[in-house]
Amino acid sequence: MTLSRWQAQGNVYLVAEESLTAGAVRAQVGDADGILEVRGRGRDWIEIAIWNTDGSLAEMSGNGTRIAARWLAEQTGAEIITVRVGPREVVARMLGGPFVEQELAYEVGEPGIAAGFRYTPVDVGNPHAVVDANPAEIREIGPALETHARFPNRTNVQVARRLDDKTIEARVWERGVGETESSGTSAIAVAAAFGASDVKIRFPGGDLHVRLDGERAYLTGTAEVAASSGGSSP
């Protein structure tokens, strides 16, 4: 199996054009944060499945869809690409160089308390629980909320604090993966939970820009080739 290695703000995904199984994913993923399985494509559209490191499937990934769009754009030259993940679609616009803007829908729920932590739920095609606290607490708060009974299908967790009017610092605990360097849908979730309509989300892996307009979010970040790896499924 030949895999190309991409990264988006430190979030690493492998891209595979072959059909995968959970076992193959666990065997091949290595130190990446997941694998993007290409299930179909045209000049300006691509359909993918997003595999987590534990062999489970994710409903959505902002960084993953951005990588998929750039991967296709490098081959076809398309400047606007629709990325399909299950029933959802993300429109991605190439901005020049490694920069890509994506448009995604989001919805903020009612705040709650779980495992002693107050959180704001946000749906960005996948579930998020945003906690306003010191991001250094992610390894305590993340696993406590991810598997809490309040979230029967588990949840992604963000621990964030506002640095100024235009900057929020955050760390991410992704369900089925653990802590990651950044997350695109997490950036949207954090901005939405904080009510910040035009803001930079600062992750350990780099910054993402989020602009909210009604129920739509516009996420801008990079996607770049990291390296290549090869192997074969068991």
Predicted regions and their residues:
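Active-site glycine-rich loop that binds ribose-phosphate moieties when present
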Residues: 105-118, 138-143
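Internal active-site segments that recognize and position negatively charged phosphoryl groups
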Residues: 115-138
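Extended Gly/Ser/Thr-rich low-complexity repeat segments
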Residues: 111-120, 228-234
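A glycine-rich beta-to-alpha transition motif near the start of alpha/beta enzyme domains, typified by
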Residues: 1-98, 130-234
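Extended Lys/Arg-rich, glycine-bearing segments that form polyanion-binding/interaction patches
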Residues: 86-112, 122
